[in-house]
């Protein structure tokens, strides 16, 4: 029997881009990377677990902030080289900047304009964890 993880086209570093979307609204919340272990754990634990390239280890989304992403559905694109996680974003904040989405800037007239508010000060989110913003 073929392993479902073998169907994924991992990049040269053994990673695949993972896009998290709100399962109700479809809004793109963030993009991160997953290795084979992260994706397998995400599927088995029904929560988003990524691979932190800067830390070189698994990153359980929400382990420091409390902003866990509960998995509702996992999708693979037609080229098998990108996954989408349809998630429930606990606390409504996906971005380390304290915003709902990491995609909070819009290109307008030759510049990037911030269009989404900070819902919670990042220092208040990470004050107890000594977090390095990823």
UniProtKB/Swiss-Prot annotation:
Compartmental location: Cytoplasm
Key words of the record: Amino-acid biosynthesis, Cytoplasm, Histidine biosynthesis, Hydrolase, Magnesium, Metal-binding, Zinc
GO process annotations (BP): L-histidine biosynthetic process
Annotated Mg(2+) binding sites: 77, 79, 81
Known EC number: 3.5.4.19
GO molecular function annotation: magnesium ion binding; phosphoribosyl-AMP cyclohydrolase activity; zinc ion binding
Binding site for Zn(2+): 78, 95, 102
Superkingdom of origin: Bacteria
Co-factor binding details: Binds 1 Mg(2+) ion per subunit. Binds 1 zinc ion per subunit.
Role: Catalyzes the hydrolysis of the adenine ring of phosphoribosyl-AMP.
Known partners and oligomeric status: Homodimer.
Similarity-based family: Belongs to the PRA-CH family.
Protein name, entry field: Phosphoribosyl-AMP cyclohydrolase
């Amino acid at each position: 029997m073929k392993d479902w993880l073998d169907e994924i086209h991992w990049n040269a570093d053994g990673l695949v881009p993972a896009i998290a979307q709100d399962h109700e609204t479809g809004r793109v919340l963030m993009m991160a990377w997953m290795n084979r272990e992260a994706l397998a754990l995400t599927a088995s634990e029904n929560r988003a677990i990524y691979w932190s390239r800067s830390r070189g280890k698994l990153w359980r989304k929400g382990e420091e902030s409390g902003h866990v992403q509960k998995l509702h559905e996992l999708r693979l694109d037609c080229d098998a080289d990108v996954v989408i996680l349809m998630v429930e974003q606990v606390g409504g904040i996906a971005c380390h900047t304290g915003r709902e989405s990491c995609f909070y800037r819009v290109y307008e007239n030759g510049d990037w304009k911030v269009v989404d508010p900070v819902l919670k000060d990042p220092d208040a989110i990470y004050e107890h964890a000594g977090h390095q913003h990823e």
